[in-house]
């Protein structure tokens, strides 16, 4: 699954650790999400969308 996490995070000048703390996941999980090695659960996708103030479909695409 493609996503805009890395771009959105960079726009806010957040490190992977910063985003991980906000989402309640590990930095490794953020890295795996950004590189497409891990697809988020629905609850995590909603937390990500809420964190960035965007709709899920504005962040993730197939």
Where are the regions that the model predicts?
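Short alpha-helical DNA-recognition segment
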Residues: 13-32
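Alpha-helical residues within the helix-turn-helix
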Residues: 10, 21, 50
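DNA major-groove recognition helix of helix-turn-helix
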Residues: 34, 60
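Residues within the helices of the helix-turn-helix
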Residues: 6, 17, 46
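A short, Lys/Arg-rich alpha-helix, primarily the initiator
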Residues: 1-11
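DNA major-groove recognition helix of helix-turn-helix/homeodomain DNA-binding modules
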Residues: 43-58
């Amino acid at each position: 699954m493609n996503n805009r996490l890395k771009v959105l995070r960079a726009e806010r000048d957040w490190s992977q650790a910063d985003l991980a703390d906000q989402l309640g996941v590990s930095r490794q999980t953020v890295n795996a999400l950004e590189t497409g090695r891990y697809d988020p659960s629905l609850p995590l996708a909603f937390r990500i969308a809420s964190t960035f103030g965007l709709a899920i479909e504005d962040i993730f695409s197939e």
